[in-house]
Amino acid sequence: MKYLHSMVRISSVDDSLDFFCNKLGVIELRRHDDDKGRYTNIFLAAPGNEDAMVELTHNWDPEEYAGGRNFGHLAYGTENIYTLCQHLMDNGVTINRPPRDGRMAFIRSPDNISIELLQQGDALAPAEPWLSMPNTGSW
């Protein structure tokens, strides 16, 4: 058995690609538009980790995703959680659970998907402003 990908439904291709690619730093691997099925699939991955993909599915006809069709969270490892969180904040992303422990943070995508950010290797030493930053919303 081989892991293939996780699928997340999105409401806006532009907002989602801005968030995932421009702010979070993942890359678009491929895209497929299905005119008959009226949807677009976009496959993303962290640079250097192209085998672990996230599939963004955009259904062209508006649809509310509720009743168990939502998702727990995605998780990405990073070389420096403080640098990534600062970059995200500088680009307007709310850090819902700051990396107070130097190891873990949570953010949300434009479609409210929870994303866990994990420090690769050992946790960084606790540091400000993260150490005293409160949680914002839910994660």
Predicted feature residues:
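Vicinal oxygen chelate
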Residues: 2-11, 29-32, 42-46, 62-139, ...
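Flexible, glycine-rich phosphate/dinucleotide-binding loops
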Residues: 35-37, 62-63, 121-124
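Short, mixed charged/polar active-site loops
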Residues: 51-53, 114
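Core segments of cupin and vicinal oxygen chelate
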Residues: 7-51
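Intrinsically disordered, low-complexity acidic/polar segments
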Residues: 53, 65, 124-126
